[in-house]
Design a protein with these regions (language model features):
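Glycine-rich phosphate-binding/catalytic subdomain of phosphoryl-transfer
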Residues: 6-203
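N-terminal helical capping/dimerization or prosegment-like subdomains
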Residues: 1-5
Length: 203
């Protein structure tokens, strides 16, 4: 759906035939706590976007690039078990809040990822990268996986708010193999992630 929406927005912009204006920095935003699970091999397909033509679509170019069809978003309460696991591992609700900046909330991305790893082990194992919605759109624009920034990572129950890096105890509590690698690094919110892929500039 998100790829469809971006394709539609690009086609409507092209149809306007308005004068092209120079753009400076671009910073996408997305639904809070939503996660996208990229399938193994998707990184190469992202790189290949730069070689596509203006009539190609993201839906076609990235078909089969996702380990799950659906992406959990904030409107969810299915992760009570995972929240309890996190609280038990870190020493209770107060300890979770002191470590990650928030109590263990069902809608938070870390608990969603933990549930998917438990209930859909094959899908999780086939995933090479987990993005938040904001870093997903940034990755599309850049044609490569981009980092989750600290402000968004603070709403995952996974980041140590003092070091602004992934919290080892929270990662372990998620019981999701290789989660640190799948998440990539946490970056400062002001960091430039790269240049826009030629795929978008030709649109």
């Amino acid at each position: 759906m998100w790829l469809d929406a971006i394709d539609l927005a690009l086609s409507r912009l092209a149809a306007l035939s308005a004068p092209t204006l120079p753009l400076g920095n671009k910073g996408p935003a997305g639904q809070q706590h939503g996660t996208v699970f990229w399938k193994a091999g998707a990184a190469e397909r992202l790189k290949d976007l730069g070689g596509l033509g203006p009539k190609d679509t993201l839906v076609e170019a990235l078909a089969g690039c996702f380990a799950r069809r659906d992406c959990p978003i904030w409107a969810d309460s299915s992760t009570t078990r995972e929240c309890h696991n996190l609280e038990e591992a870190l020493g209770g609700p107060k300890a979770v809040a002191e470590a990650t900046g928030s109590a263990a909330y069902c809608r938070f991305s870390g608990n969603q990822i933990s549930r998917i790893a438990r209930r859909e082990p094959e899908a999780y194992a086939s995933c090479e990268r987990v993005s938040l919605v904001s870093s997903f759109v940034t990755s599309l624009l850049a044609g490569r996986y981009c980092s989750i920034d600290a402000s968004d990572a603070s709403g995952m129950n996974l980041m140590d708010i003092r070091s602004r890096d992934w919290h080892e105890g929270a990662l372990a509590a998620a019981k999701a193999d290789g989660l640190r690698e799948k998440l990539g690094r946490v970056c400062p919110s002001y960091e430039c992630q790269g240049k826009v892929s030629p795929f978008f500039s030709t649109k």
